[in-house]
């Protein structure tokens, strides 16, 4: 039912997550659920899945990466965070405490001087450094749009317009009513929260 969108160029990454909470698979219980977990100053994670798993895994990941930065005096890079999340989910699969979550990780790597976008699913399949990614059923409607219209040198305005086009297509074609999306952008200057996309 949920939907995550990620678009990346060399200069920025845009992430959007729906704000809905569904109960019993079909009842809209809440339209203000925040699925974002800030992992650093220029690093964030959007997480969907079983509600309890999302809350526990998201908070656990956030606190572990904060602890790492306190102990070592620096934050992990986006690609390191991606590997940490993938390994954590993979280790959970081999125990009784596995997490049924799908995540998008976006950030800006100051060392490599470029944006990062990656994903990990609930089976610990990881995709790193991708131009665009989706999680959730609605993504099936959007890959064709991206294949046709994505350009690696898009401006922020063009990237946001493309993201809005994908969200609009999901709204038009998906059976569930997803009332709004939280949108963030990360670039060299840092993290910014943009206005929510509401319907």
UniProtKB/Swiss-Prot annotation:
Subcellular location: Cytoplasm; Nucleus
InterPro entries named among the record's database cross-references: Ntn_hydrolases_N, Proteasome_beta2, Proteasome_sua/b, Proteasome_suB-type
GO cellular component: cytosol; nucleus; proteasome core complex, beta-subunit complex
Name of one Pfam family that matches: Proteasome
Annotated GO biological process: proteasome-mediated ubiquitin-dependent protein catabolic process
Principal subcellular localization: cytoplasm
Covalent S-S links between cysteines: none
Keywords, ordered alphabetically: Cytoplasm, Nucleus, Proteasome
Entry-linked CDD domains: proteasome_beta_type_2 (cd03758)
Transcription regulation recorded as keyword: no
SUPFAM superfamilies: N-terminal nucleophile aminohydrolases (Ntn hydrolases) (SSF56235)
Assembly and interaction partners: The 26S proteasome consists of a 20S proteasome core and two 19S regulatory subunits. The 20S proteasome core is composed of 28 subunits that are arranged in four stacked rings, resulting in a barrel-shaped structure. The two end rings are each formed by seven alpha subunits, and the two central rings are each formed by seven beta subunits. The catalytic chamber with the active sites is on the inside of the barrel.
The family this protein is said to belong to: Belongs to the peptidase T1B family.
Function description: Non-catalytic component of the proteasome, a multicatalytic proteinase complex which is characterized by its ability to cleave peptides with Arg, Phe, Tyr, Leu, and Glu adjacent to the leaving group at neutral or slightly basic pH. The proteasome has an ATP-dependent proteolytic activity.
The protein, known as: Proteasome subunit beta type-2
Protein's organism: Caenorhabditis elegans
Encoding gene per record: pbs-4
């Amino acid at each position: 039912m949920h939907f995550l969108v990620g678009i990346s160029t060399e200069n920025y990454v845009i992430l959007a997550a729906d704000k809905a909470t569904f109960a019993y698979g079909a009842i809209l219980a809440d339209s203000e659920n925040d699925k974002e977990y800030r992992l650093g100053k220029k690093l964030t994670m959007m997480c969907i899945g079983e509600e309890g798993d999302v809350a526990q895994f998201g908070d656990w990941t956030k606190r572990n990466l904060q602890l790492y930065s306190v102990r070592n005096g620096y934050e992990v890079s986006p690609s390191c965070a991606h590997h940490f999340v993938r390994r954590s989910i993979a280790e959970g699969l081999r125990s009784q405490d596995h997490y049924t979550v799908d995540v998008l990780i976006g950030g800006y790597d100051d060392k490599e001087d470029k944006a990062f976008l990656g994903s990990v699913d609930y089976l610990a399949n990881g995709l790193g450094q991708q131009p665009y990614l989706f999680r959730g059923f609605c993504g099936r409607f959007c890959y064709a749009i991206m294949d046709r219209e994505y350009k690696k040198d898009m401006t922020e305005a063009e990237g946001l317009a493309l993201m809005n086009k994908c969200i609009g297509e999901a709204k038009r074609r998906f059976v569930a009513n997803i009332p709004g999306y939280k949108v963030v952008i990360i670039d060299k200057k840092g993290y910014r929260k943009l206005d929510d996309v509401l319907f």
